[in-house]
A protein has these predicted regions:
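Short, solvent-exposed loop/turn segments at secondary-structure junctions
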Residues: 56-60, 124, 148-149, 199-202, ...
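Conserved core segment of the aminotransferase class I/II
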Residues: 5-16, 256-343
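Short beta-strand
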Residues: 50-52, 87, 267, 366-372, ...
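Generic structural signal for small/hydrophobic residues in well-ordered secondary structure
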Residues: 53, 98, 141, 155, ...
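Conserved glycine-rich beta-strand-loop-beta hairpin in the small C-terminal domain of fold type I
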Residues: 319, 326, 338-353, 365-380, ...
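N-terminal small-domain helix-loop-helix segment of the aminotransferase-like
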Residues: 2-9, 14-18, 25-121
Length: 437
């Protein structure tokens, strides 16, 4: 093991040795190369006043060499801002701005210590990093049966984890009891990664406050029994809450700093929160009992290991994307502009809900899972196969949706103008009539 990794592990153990036990074998070995090219280049940046031949970038004086045909597309951004490398941790102004946004949107975190977010290349990359750092082959990963298929690709196929599922719904509410029962199977000393995503993809469901607290209580009860709990909160669609009775803050708030046996990880992204899907800017933040300050050596070590894994695989994330998001977050009109987009999304949700309420005849062929948030809703066909309906919709009507499993069909009302929603459902109904003949 590299001495730098050994030092980071010592930092973790000095605060809470249980976190070291939670790490995967790679998570224990990984480190940020703070004494290599990057650190020497950083020293030279500060001290090499005459000549600096350290970093592999092409410069003209103090400006990044550039092609006008590139920079002509980036008015208002300098070549150095757009083209030079970002640190593996991410740009510090962006990390600070995102933490400020987390606190703005989650006021109950005001006095709760958690790490400074590390920048990732989108939400998917954040999930991948969590897997790399905390999951070994055969480890247990718990998630709902209605989940994003990329979870399977990452945790099951890539990392060879043992996936366990609980039924997401119990009638019109989330199946908290089923989640709790799965956790009860874990023995003291065993490790589990629990993945929870609200608003949920594919269903568009966010639990209410009581349900959310019950989920947190179940995780904390497992931690109190001695289970090593890594709770991954996937906040990809955070903020898009349309119903009055759904949680308004991240589940991370109910877990952060609550137990020495529970590491809460918040994975979120500018992707949906800033409406910048292709910029690929995500974040990872950590919190656990025993790390009593935001600059705790434990958080410093976890940030370093995260940055080290980024360095090892992609070196760093796009500086240009990070600059754009930083400028957006620090713009005085950011929250007002975000609210305008949220209200458009709310009207699409309302139209979807109203369309289903006004057409009870649709229930002959399909019913909707509970939904109150996010980008999606999901219907379940009573008898028809989802992929058969999908193909018929495409071939005859030029309409697209996502078949998930045998009966489930995901629809993204986020991508439809309000006036398109009712005709889409009527088209789905007509397709079902066609196939039932």
């Amino acid at each position: 093991m590299n001495d730098l990794a050994y030092h980071l592990n010592e930092q973790i153990c000095s605060v809470n040795p249980i976190v070291f036990e939670m790490l995967s074998s790679l998570g224990k070995r990984i480190y940020f190369p703070s004494k290599g090219i990057l650190s020497q280049s950083a020293e030279a940046h500060k001290l090499a006043k005459n000549f600096n031949a350290t970093i592999g970038t092409a410069m003209e004086g103090t400006t990044a060499m550039n092609l006008p045909c590139v920079m002509d597309n980036l008015p208002g951004i300098s070549p150095n801002e757009a083209l030079l490398y970002a640190p593996s941790y991410g740009l510090k102004p962006l990390r600070d701005a995102w933490k400020a946004k987390i606190l703005h949107d989650n006021p109950s975190l005001k006095d709760v210590p958690f790490s400074t977010p590390v920048v990732t290349c989108g939400l998917t990359h954040a999930l991948s990093l969590v897997g790399d750092l905390f999951v070994d082959p055969g480890d247990t990963v718990l998630m709902p049966d209605l989940c994003w298929d990329n979870y399977l690709l990452n945790f099951q196929d890539r990392l060879q984890a043992n996936l366990e599922f609980f039924p997401f719904f119990d009638g019109e509410r989330m199946n908290v009891k089923g989640f709790e029962e799965r956790l009860m199977h874990m023995l003291p000393g065993e490790k589990i990664l629990a993945v929870l995503n609200f608003p949920n993809n594919p269903t568009g469901y966010t639990p209410g406050e009581k349900e959310g607290q019950a989920l947190a209580d179940a995780l904390l009860a497992a931690a109190e029994r001695g289970v090593r709990v890594v709770a991954l909160v996937d906040d990809a669609y955070f903020g898009l809450f349309y119903a009055q009775d759904s949680m308004r803050e991240s589940l991370f708030c109910k877990l952060a700093g609550k137990s020495r046996n529970l590491l809460a990880i918040k994975a979120d992204a500018a992707t949906k929160e800033c409406y910048v899907w292709g910029l690929r800017v995500g974040f990872l933040s950590y919190s656990i009992g025993g790390a009593d300050t935001a600059d705790s050596p434990l958080y410093t070590a976890l940030e370093a290991k995260t940055a080290g894994q980024i360095r090892a695989v992609i070196s760093n994330c796009s500086a240009l994307s990070q600059r754009v998001v930083t400028k957006a977050l620090t713009n005085e009109g950011f929250y007002e502009q975000r609210h305008r987009c949220e209200e458009i999304m709310r009207t699409r949700y309302d139209r979807t809900r109203k369309t289903l309420d006004e057409h009870p005849e649709y229930r002959r062929f399909f019913t909707a899972y509970p939904f109150n948030s996010g980008y999606f809703m999901c219907i379940r066909f009573n008898d028809l196969r989802a992929d058969e309906v999908r193909r018929h919709l495409l071939d005859k009507y030029g309409a697209g949706g996502i078949a998930m499993g045998e009966r489930d069909f995901r629809l993204a009302f986020s991508s439809l103008d309000e006036e398109e929603i009712a005709p889409l459902f009527q088209t789905i109904y007509q397709a079902c009539l066609d196939l039932s003949v």
